[in-house]
């Protein structure tokens, strides 16, 4: 428990203090946001706002995790390192994308094939490594069995698992990327989901099969390799994003950029895969799914019928064009995300209670 508290507090402190320093550095170098001409007119004032702010919470999360381990004297686990690797790797792809947008003033950044290649390399490396490093109970960080609130009984094999893991990583990283269109929206939503995974990791640790002899209901235990370590990473991410939100909320002093959005999406996917809650992530991260589906519906409808369902996609811009203020959209979408987290945690607990 002390690890979780230290990780969250350190992550919060580092981004609260470190983000304004990053803002000054990025502003001095002229690394400002490039605004597309086809977006809402109210976004014109955002042009030039420092971007690549994801650097702040990526570094803060890594430092917070490591310091929490040093302070408490606890061992560093493979599961935590794998999530940090996935987060940093996806963040690096996003950083290259942001850098090209800024330096070359090209709104689309990396070429689609190059961006996809980078995400695939990082994702495949994570998927392969997550099936290594068995512990004394022969648990590896990930499992080849699909999961909702825990693993299902059948395995899909390592090859299909890698394909599935890649799908999750790409879907979540791009889902957060699509959500990051309004000040504080993606950051605030991510704080809620990381908070949920902090709780899930702690609960799984207390009900771990490694402690089955001490449990009142051993049949409901969790076969997760390092649940407490995942909770520490999630707490570090929650704290770091919460501190970043101070500077990212409207009117934003800095944007996370693709550096941040791809990193957060990767971290969410990694936590879901390693905590055996893969399908549950679709509910816990319901806002990201909803916004992603709005783009799929918009593109599909236009290609098939020549008509658009929404005034603009992603969904948050549709409501802006209907006359909602940016802050109103963000707060209402946060409420939706909060309800998704409540439902997701309720289902997680129900899955455990049903086995009592």
From Swiss-Prot:
Membrane-crossing residue ranges in chain numbering: 3-23, 51-71, 80-100, 114-134, 152-172, 185-205, 227-247, 254-274, 279-299, 333-353
Keywords attached to this entry: Cell cycle, Cell division, Cell membrane, Cell shape, Cell wall biogenesis/degradation, Magnesium, Membrane, Metal-binding, Peptidoglycan synthesis, Transferase, Transmembrane, Transmembrane helix
Catalytic activity: UDP-N-acetyl-alpha-D-muramoyl-L-alanyl-gamma-D-glutamyl-meso-2,6-diaminopimeloyl-D-alanyl-D-alanine + di-trans,octa-cis-undecaprenyl phosphate = di-trans,octa-cis-undecaprenyl diphospho-N-acetyl-alpha-D-muramoyl-L-alanyl-D-glutamyl-meso-2,6-diaminopimeloyl-D-alanyl-D-alanine + UMP
Enzyme Commission code(s) on record: 2.7.8.13
Molecular-function annotations in GO: metal ion binding; phospho-N-acetylmuramoyl-pentapeptide-transferase activity; UDP-N-acetylmuramoyl-L-alanyl-D-glutamyl-meso-2,6-diaminopimelyl-D-alanyl-D-alanine:undecaprenyl-phosphate transferase activity
Compartments where found: Cell membrane
Enzyme class name: transferase
Membrane topology type: Multi-pass membrane protein
Family recorded in the similarity comment: Belongs to the glycosyltransferase 4 family. MraY subfamily.
UniProt protein name: Phospho-N-acetylmuramoyl-pentapeptide-transferase
């Amino acid at each position: 428990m002390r690890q979780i508290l230290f990780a969250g507090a350190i992550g919060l402190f580092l981004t609260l203090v470190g983000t304004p320093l990053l803002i000054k550095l990025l502003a001095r170098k002229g690394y400002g946001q490039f605004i597309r001409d086809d977006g809402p007119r109210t976004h014109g004032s955002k042009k030039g706002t420092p971007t690549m702010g994801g650097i702040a919470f990526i570094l803060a999360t890594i430092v917070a995790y490591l310091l929490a381990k040093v302070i408490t004297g606890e061992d560093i686990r493979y599961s935590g390192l794998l999530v940090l690797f996935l987060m940093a790797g996806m963040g690096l792809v996003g950083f290259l994308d942001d850098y090209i947008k800024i330096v070359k003033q090209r709104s689309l950044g990396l070429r689609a094939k190059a961006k996809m290649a980078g995400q695939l390399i990082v994702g495949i490396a994570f998927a392969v490594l997550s099936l290594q490093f068995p512990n004394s109970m022969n648990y590896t960080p990930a499992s080849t069995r699909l999961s909702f609130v825990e693993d299902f009984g059948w395995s899909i094999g390592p090859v299909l698992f890698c394909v599935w893991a890649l799908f999750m990583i790409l879907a979540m990283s791009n889902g957060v990327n699509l959500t990051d269109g309004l000040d504080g929206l993606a950051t605030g939503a991510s704080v809620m989901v990381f908070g949920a995974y902090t709780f899930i990791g702690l609960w799984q640790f207390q009900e771990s099969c490694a402690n089955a002899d001490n449990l009142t209901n051993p049949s409901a235990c969790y076969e997760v390799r390092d649940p407490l370590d995942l909770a520490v990473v999630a707490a570090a991410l929650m704290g770091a994003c919460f501190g970043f939100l101070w500077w990212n909320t409207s009117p934003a002093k800095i944007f996370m950029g693709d550096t941040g959005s791809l990193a957060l999406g990767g971290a969410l996917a990694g936590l879901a895969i390693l905590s055996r809650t893969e399908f549950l992530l679709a509910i816990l991260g319901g806002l990201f799914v909803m916004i992603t589906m709005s783009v799929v519906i918009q593109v599909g409808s236009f290609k098939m019928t020549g008509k658009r369902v929404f005034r603009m996609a992603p969904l948050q811009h549709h409501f802006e064009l209907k006359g909602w203020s940016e802050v109103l959209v963000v707060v209402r979408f946060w409420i939706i995300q909060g309800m998704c987290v409540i439902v997701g945690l309720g289902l997680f607990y129900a899955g455990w209670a049903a086995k009592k």
